[in-house]
């Protein structure tokens, strides 16, 4: 696990912990590294899990799918991001999301049950980790609240403007990149890609924004 310390140091889950403490925690919670190729499932809806995942390299999409293949993207996980925490922390909970590798990736699996029970070595840093987990979960709630705000808008135009405005504020810039390609953005906002493309063209003609691929620049009048 030594080679992954640069990633783990920058992960909010390990904030305030030394390298030795991080390695001790990984042993305590029976951390295991797995690899998954692009397009494969890491977690699948309908299953249950006792572990949460941490992206060591690559990226993955957290999605919901129906029986006809319609996809709703909930979030994107990049290096250092977690997924599956609420389900792993709730005994018997059935996943209503799937996590799919967007590219070849390495994932660290952490047993949440071991994290939430008394540490056999009574380590002081175990309590820090629990506090960090609460913070990570709270931040994820805020992110999902933002998504609800965007998709609750009535029109495709309103959804786009809501999302792009929020991204501009989050990144403190009128010029920014988003983590999605066009199809993924449509799936994230729960709109049809063709309709979204039409609205983006209108917004550019109206002088509200300039966009190329996943880069956007918002224009103020």
Where are these regions (language model features)?
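Cyclic nucleotide-binding regulatory module and flanking cytosolic helices
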Residues: 1-38, 87-90
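A small-molecule sensor/coupling module
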Residues: 22, 95, 113-155
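Short, small/polar residue-rich loop motifs at catalytic or cofactor-binding pockets
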Residues: 28-29, 47-49
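Glycine- and acidic-residue-biased ligand/ion/polar-headgroup-sensing regions
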Residues: 39, 50-63, 78-80
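Short phosphate-coordinating micro-motif centered on Lys-Gly-acidic
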Residues: 41-47
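Cyclic-nucleotide recognition modules
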Residues: 73-131
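Phosphate-/nucleic-acid-contacting segments
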Residues: 154-221
